[in-house]
Amino acid sequence: HGIVAIKDKEVYRADLERVIDAAQAVAIPADQKILHILPQEYIIDNQEGIKEPLGMSGVRLEAKVHLVTCAVNAAQNIEKCIRRCGLEVEEIILEQLASSYSVLTDDERELGVCLVDIGGGTTDIAIFTEGSIRHTGVIPIAGDQVTNDIAMALRTLSSVGVVIASS
């Protein structure tokens, strides 16, 4: 949550940048870094629910944001791996956010939706309401565990569990 005074009584891009900077001024562990600062809503003089405050008038601007952090070492290792392949990293994006760009519509984000991406090793979750991401999470239970559970229950090979789980 960031709070700043609106300098000229009208919200300009510089005011938005300042309030976002204020919102990210939180203590995070040294082994973590901020990956994304995702604005959820703005508040001008206690008027809540503002999505686009540019040009609006007031004296106090607040921003409610969703901060996404990641392990510094994990990000560095991903970047090193990509560079070893002869490619450059333009940006690291949270998996749930990237998935949401490819499968959700603006209407779904606005109405409210829970995106659940069941991968092999983890299940990634993102909750959207009123057009903004409100929560992200990772559950360490996913497809590989389901496959192994099926194979164990049927006392068969994991490869058979894969076939059953995907049918």
Which residues make up each language-model segment?
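Nucleotide/phosphate-binding catalytic cleft detector across ATP-hydrolyzing
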Residues: H1-L115, S132, L157-V160, S166-S167
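Glycine-rich phosphate-binding loop of actin/hexokinase-like ATP-binding domains
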Residues: V65, L111-A153
